[in-house]
């Protein structure tokens, strides 16, 4: 067997574009939140809501809007990091099949839904439900990947 995918017992591996598009959209979400946050914080400074010396002492009084966007932005460096790692591993080991890509899309869609609720109504139950679905989907992706890797024949 010269094809690594066949040697690892894999079916059809998706194209790099199909695999990375959900990851790219998650990265875009992170940058959208960042570039939204910057002017909000600038406005907080110019309106006097927040003072630079308070930020330096880690005691800022950001506006509610700034806090919502900041927390949503910060949240993009928690669970999505595991998604980024898994996507790269799945591609490199040729385990990024159709099931992987579909689950990746579900993960990213629920991350967008969570971020949307976070920066709009901020309904904790709804936001938590969206987070829970994305966390469960990512856990399933990791479990499938681990099983595939651990049960693959040695090449």
Each language-model region and where it sits:
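Juxtamembrane boundary at the C-terminal end of a transmembrane helix
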Residues: 143-155
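Interfacial loop-to-transmembrane junctions
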Residues: 113-137
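Cytosolic, membrane-interface loops and tails of multi-pass inner-membrane proteins
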Residues: 35, 39-70
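Short alpha-helical packing/oligomerization segments
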Residues: 85-108
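Alpha-helical transmembrane segments
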Residues: 19-33
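Short, strongly hydrophobic alpha-helical membrane anchors
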Residues: 1-18, 153-155
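Core segments of transmembrane alpha-helices
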Residues: 74-89
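Alpha-helical transmembrane segments of multipass membrane proteins
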Residues: 29-34, 114, 138
């Amino acid at each position: 067997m010269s094809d690594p995918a066949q040697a690892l017992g894999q079916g059809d591996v998706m194209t790099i574009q199909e695999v990375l598009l959900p990851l790219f959209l998650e990265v875009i979400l992170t940058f959208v939140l960042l570039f939204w946050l910057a002017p909000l914080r600038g406005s907080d400074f110019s309106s006097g809501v927040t003072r630079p010396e308070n930020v330096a002492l880690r005691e800022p009084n950001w506006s509610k809007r700034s806090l919502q966007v900041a927390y949503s932005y910060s949240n993009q460096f928690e669970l999505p990091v595991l998604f980024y790692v898994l996507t790269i591993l799945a591609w490199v080991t040729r385990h990024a099949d159709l099931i992987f890509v579909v689950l990746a899309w579900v993960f990213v869609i629920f991350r967008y839904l969570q971020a949307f609720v976070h920066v709009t109504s901020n309904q904790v139950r709804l936001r938590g439900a969206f987070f829970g679905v994305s966390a469960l989907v990512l856990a399933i992706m990791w479990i499938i990947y681990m099983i595939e890797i651990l049960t693959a024949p040695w090449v």
